[in-house]
């Protein structure tokens, strides 16, 4: 049962579709998700009762019929890699030329698009480096740890990943603010609108990705 004291991150773990509701009201459920409903609604355009009612109307099942909470660490890592790492690498490759084109064509009259391109590149490059580090070093170390094997500096590994997630979250917030919540101006061309739409999708995917690691995977080692 969800109450005013229920923790946002735990709600999203149990009811993944609730992420859409938290996102709608600008409530962080990944890096800042370890807060209660009461804390989360402060300074937001929703009260706790309304938020709880909306969540309670959702079906209580995982998207894709995979209840990630009950996966062991190796299985969850494999899920994260196939569901997020592979798809995000592909999307970065496909989206980047459009971001460059919009900045080049419209940047002279809309300088914030050049700034958006810079933020996007920081976000993309940081995520690509982060995912490579996870795949090549950190995830294999966590799998060893889950099997009871000795891993040096295991707490440092997790803290470093959490710190990376926090930096990524700030870049996503900066891009959203710069683009007026991804609302294109009336004169925006189709490519401009496409970039905004796909950046919003990447933001959603990244939030879900980070939530799974911060609040499900890493909790298995606490």
UniProtKB/Swiss-Prot annotation:
Instruction: Name a GO CC annotation attached to this entry.
Output: cytoplasm
- Name the residues that span the membrane: none
Sorted alphabetically, the keyword list is:
Cytoplasm, Iron, Metal-binding, Stress response
Subcellular location(s): the record lists: Cytoplasm
- Example of a GO biological process term: response to nitrosative stress
Q: Which family does it belong to?
A: Belongs to the RIC family. ScdA subfamily.
Q: What task does this protein carry out?
A: Di-iron-containing protein involved in the repair of iron-sulfur clusters damaged by oxidative and nitrosative stress conditions.
Q: List the protein's name.
A: Iron-sulfur cluster repair protein ScdA
* Species this chain originates from: Staphylococcus haemolyticus (strain JCSC1435)
């Amino acid at each position: 049962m969800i109450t005013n004291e229920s923790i946002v991150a735990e709600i999203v773990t149990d009811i993944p579709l609730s992420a859409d509701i938290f996102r709608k009201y600008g409530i962080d459920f990944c890096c800042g998700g370890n807060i209660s409903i009461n804390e989360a609604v402060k300074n937001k355009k929703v009260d706790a009762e309304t938020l709880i009612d909306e969540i309670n109307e959702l079906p209580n099942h995982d998207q894709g019929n995979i209840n990630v909470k009950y996966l062991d660490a190796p299985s969850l890592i494999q899920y994260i890699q196939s569901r997020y790492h592979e798809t995000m690498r592909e999307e970065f490759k496909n989206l980047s030329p459009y971001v460059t084109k919009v900045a080049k064509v419209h940047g002279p009259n809309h300088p914030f698009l050049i700034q958006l391109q810079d933020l996007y590149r920081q976000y993309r490059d940081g995520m690509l480096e982060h995912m490579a580090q996870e795949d090549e070093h950190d995830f294999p170390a966590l799998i060893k740890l889950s099997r009871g094997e000795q891993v040096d500096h295991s707490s440092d590994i997790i803290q470093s990943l959490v710190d990376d997630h926090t930096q990524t979250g700030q870049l996503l917030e900066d891009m959203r603010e710069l683009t007026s919540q991804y609302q294109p101006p009336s004169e925006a061309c189709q490519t401009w609108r496409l970039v905004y739409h796909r950046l919003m999708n990447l933001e959603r995917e990244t939030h879900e990705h980070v939530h799974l690691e911060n609040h499900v995977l890493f909790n298995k080692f606490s």
